[in-house]
Amino acid sequence: MSHPHDTGIQDLEAPVVLVVPADPSFVRLARLVVSSLAADLAFDFDEIEDLRIAADELVSAAIGAAEPFSPVRIQLTTGQGVLSLEASAATSTLGAELDPLAAQIVEALVASHDVSTAGGFITVKFRSHTPGSSQHLA
């Protein structure tokens, strides 16, 4: 039986890129894009919610550390059985990190995540194994 949202997408031919202002009201747009892509990749409902929450926490961290009015670039890619999110923005914050509770939440929801600041930018990332990959739900 096929997944109700299965569109046959296995790997994206090109990244999905979203650029939003450093304004917390745009976090919901990132969540929507992540949820939609995860559904197209045949993640189940609970996994989609996990990815949505992880995206919320990480994109919120990037927006929170970003310079006012600067763009936040969010890129989603797939390949080799992995869905990846990376968000980056200009920042003057050194050593940015997730709130400890947010870090625990994200750690429980995705295969790996990272928050770093270098060269005047904050970058947040997560990776999650896609349905059908050998590591999915491992």
Q: Locations of the language-model features?
A:
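Bergerat-fold GHKL ATPase/HATPase_c domain
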Residues: M1-I53
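Conserved beta-strand-loop-beta-strand hairpin that lines the nucleotide-binding pocket
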Residues: M1-V17, A61-A138
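Conserved ATP-binding N-box helix of the HATPase_c
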Residues: F45-F69
